[in-house]
Every structure is written in C-alpha cells, then in structure tokens.
Amino acid sequence: MEKQIAVLPGDGIGPEVTDAAIEVLQAVADRFGHTFSYKKALLGGCAIDEVGTPLPEETLDVCRHADGILLGAVGGPKWDTLPGHLRPEKGLLGLRKGLNLFANLRPVTVYDSLADASTLKNDVIDGVDLLIVRELTGGLYFGEPRERRGEGETEEVVDTLLYTRGEMRRIIRKAFELAMVRNKHVTSVDKANVLESSRMWREVANEVAQEFPEVTLEHMLVDNAAMQLIRRPKQFDVLVTENLFGDILSDEASMVTGSLGMLPSASLTSDGPGLYEPIHGSAPDIAGKGVANPLATIASCAMMLKYSFGLHEEAKTIEDAIEAVLKQGYRTADIAKPGEESSSTKAITDAVVEAIQASVDIS
C-alpha cells in the first residue's frame, strides 16, 4: 500500500515527537511492505514567524492532497500577545474547519504498567477503556456573532452557540457507529435542563438511537458526567458531546491515565484525510532537550493506520509495541515515578521501533 502523509510539526516539542512518529511509521512500512511518503508543512507559531499567518494556504493544500495528516503541537507564550486572529491556535481551528473535520476521537486507556501514574486509586481506573467523541466544527468556538458591544459597566459580550440539526446528527451517528464495534453503549452528554441547544441535541440522539437498536443510549448532564469520569470511569464506553463540553471533558478524562503525554486523538471527516495528533501541548519549556514523551504521537499514528488507511493489524502492532516498551520500564519524566530514572525521546522511540521489528510476522 502506498500512502502520502502530511506532517505538520508545529511548535515547541512538536518537531521532536513527529520525527519520532515518522521513525515508527517507517518501521511499520518496512515490516509490512508498505510505502509511506511524508510532506512537511507549516502550522501555528512557526508559520506566523515564517510567513505571517498561522495557516498558510499552501499547508491547507498539502493536507487536502494527503491520505492522512500528522500534527505535533501548536502554540506557546511567544505568541500569546498577538491578536486573536493571528494566534497559533487559530491555525488549528482553521485547519479543522477547512477540512471539515467534525468528529474528534479521544480514546482513554489505562496501561497496566502505568496505573501508578494516575492520582486515582487502582481499583477505580483498572480496566478503563473509553472513547470521547467530540463535535469539532460548531458550537461556541465557531458561532457568530462573537463580539463586544458598548462600553464601561454596560459593555456587553456575546458568544453564540450555534448548531444545525444535521451537524448534531452526523456526530451522534458517528458515536453510535463506533460503539457498534466496541461495547455498544453510548452516553450522550448535554445540559438539557438549561440550554435549548442541548434539548435539541437530546432529541436528535433519541432519533439516531432508533437506527441502532443493539446500542444502549444513556443521557447524562455535563456536570454529572464530569463527576462520574473521576468517580467511576469504567461505566463509560463511548461518550458523545458538543464542542465546548467535549473540550473540557476530554482533558479531564486524560488525567485518569496520569499523563497527557500518553493520549492520542483523531479528527475525522466523512470524505477526506483525517488529522492525528497528541492531545498534549507544545511544552516549550522542554523543547529541544530530547526528553519529550513521543508515545501519544506514536499512538496517534496507530489511529491513522486504523481509521484512515484501514490497516488494523499494523495499528495493533504499534499499540502492542507501546505496551511492551512500557512493560520493559521505559519512562519519560512525565510518567516516571519520583526518583525513577527517566528515558529520552530517542531511547523510547528506538525501543518502540525494535519492538515492531521483533513482532511476529502477520503480513
């Protein structure tokens, strides 16, 4: 199989973790007889510095012609004083909108060998395997008008939470489709006791549920969902929610695992390349030191192989390699115990590559 991958290293540790991920992808390609080609492009702060905009048109074009997109991280304090439309994060929002990446998938899995990294008790997190499906191109982050009006103490500010019924239906249906190949349980998260948009969301969820009689649908208010993710995360299979709620809940759920450095994500559309990225930030404080955790980016590559390329065995090979490396005791500083020796980005990447090369031939 031949595939072209757009690589957007971005800012901070982004170039380091994407380089590590490319090494792993190349090991998979060599191992299974595939050909992956890579084309790098600018996004975020580095794009602002070089061409004056966080999302150059050339980058959008490279992504549109790719089979999959790998992103490192964007942003950093260097660009925090810029106007909102010139911030690095605006480039990522524009990329999502430009490629119609409406479905964000955030898997949360607790590795047995990393159970101690979580601040929660082992009996609470043991066996956690949930998936948050977040709507990504609507809601408060994109709704108009978005403005300030008036001045002084009577100055008003307006943000708009806007969705169409169709936008709700496509993301909820995606959650049900994913639940069909998991444990057939969907928790729809809303604020239907207050928000009109949530009341319509709940209506649409009930309509979609009729198409999937094998799947159990549960409605949960967002404040309760936030509590339950910490209190009893094992109850969840697939959670689906709108943009703002999903942004908050997915970061909360990430701490069930103990480190943002372990969690991948996928942003998908109905027809076009998916975007795959770690959920951690650009971590400029450790950029260039060779200590960044590459495992979330590597795991994001496994999601690319699965969801964009249909290469499920290859994806599992990466996932198994990550598990094997953790069992061997490799740890970057973010997941190491106090006083425990930590591994470099290169050491962990090399170990994952070796584990892939040593895997049983299933091609």
UniProtKB/Swiss-Prot annotation:
- Main localisation, per the record? cytoplasm
- Leader sequence residues: none
Pfam families the UniProt entry points to: Iso_dh
Task: Describe the reaction catalysed, as an equation.
Answer: (2R,3S)-3-isopropylmalate + NAD(+) = 4-methyl-2-oxopentanoate + CO2 + NADH
Q: Where in the cell is it found?
A: Cytoplasm
The record's annotation in PROSITE patterns points to: IDH_IMDH (PS00470)
The GO terms this record gives for MF are: 3-isopropylmalate dehydrogenase activity; magnesium ion binding; NAD binding
What cellular component terms from Gene Ontology apply here? Answer: cytosol
Residues flagged as site, Important for catalysis: 141, 191
- Source domain of life is Bacteria
Main EC class of this protein?
oxidoreductase
What is one GO biological process annotated to this record? L-leucine biosynthetic process
Specify whether Transmembrane helix is a keyword of the entry: no
Details of cofactor binding? Binds 1 Mg(2+) or Mn(2+) ion per subunit.
What pathway does this protein act in?
Answer: Amino-acid biosynthesis; L-leucine biosynthesis; L-leucine from 3-methyl-2-oxobutanoate: step 3/4
Q: Where does substrate bind?
A: 96, 106, 134, 223
Cofactor field: Mg(2+); Mn(2+)
Q: Where does Mg(2+) bind?
A: 223, 247, 251
Q: Which UniProt keywords apply?
A: Amino-acid biosynthesis, Branched-chain amino acid biosynthesis, Cytoplasm, Leucine biosynthesis, Magnesium, Manganese, Metal-binding, NAD, Oxidoreductase
Tell me the subunit arrangement. Homodimer.
What job does this protein perform? Answer: Catalyzes the oxidation of 3-carboxy-2-hydroxy-4-methylpentanoate (3-isopropylmalate) to 3-carboxy-4-methyl-2-oxopentanoate. The product decarboxylates to 4-methyl-2 oxopentanoate.
Q: Which family does it belong to?
A: Belongs to the isocitrate and isopropylmalate dehydrogenases family. LeuB type 1 subfamily.
The protein's name in its UniProt record: 3-isopropylmalate dehydrogenase
